[in-house]
Amino acid sequence: MKFKYLLYLYILLGIIEIFLVGFQINFSIYLRPICVVLIYSFYVVNVKRHNYFLLFYLTCELINEVFFLIDFSKYFILVLTCYSLATFSMLYHIWPVVKRANFKTGWGDLLRPFLGLLGILFIFWELIFLVFKNLPDYYVFFPALTALLSWIFFCSIIPAKNKHPDNFALYFIGGSMAVMAPTMFIYEFLWSSSIVLYFSLTSMLLLKIFLVWYLINLDKILNCKEEYF
């Protein structure tokens, strides 16, 4: 990949912002737009074209994350609406991989992903019971939950049915989302510990790194002539 200094600078600013937020230094959120410019620029210089779906995703995620840090309860509808739009928009990118995957044979390969998904669903179910009565709005919560579960499902199933090495990044993407969303709710409604916040912010940082890395390699995955599908 080219221009890796953009990625390194993004990681550096992301780490600085995480520590500043942990010390309750509020101006740290102004670093987030800079981080978005850096990670999107890293994508563009590598693929040599714009990706407006990715730009839309990064913009929605920026709004989601900034207003989560300002006041999640107050801006609950805005945060979850942007989260849902961002997550559903990214299904556009992986859909070509989904269409080419063979789901008709080898269900034994799907056992581990399904068991993992069941474990995640159990954790989410328990978490919903704990926070549900405190949610400011129920109607926006369930579309956001659907978006999260859909994304985790595809991130778990695709690498099991398409063995291309670069698809392994989807496990990290799905895992980052599986950490990010619950920790946002835990921090706001159950346990306002800086440790929980660090987990949430770190997962936000890692999610974008693995996502952009995967999208840079997506054409190579789709055009690969080896029998991975």
Task: Outline where the language-model segments fall.
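Polytopic alpha-helical membrane-helix bundles and their juxtamembrane interface segments
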Residues: 1-229
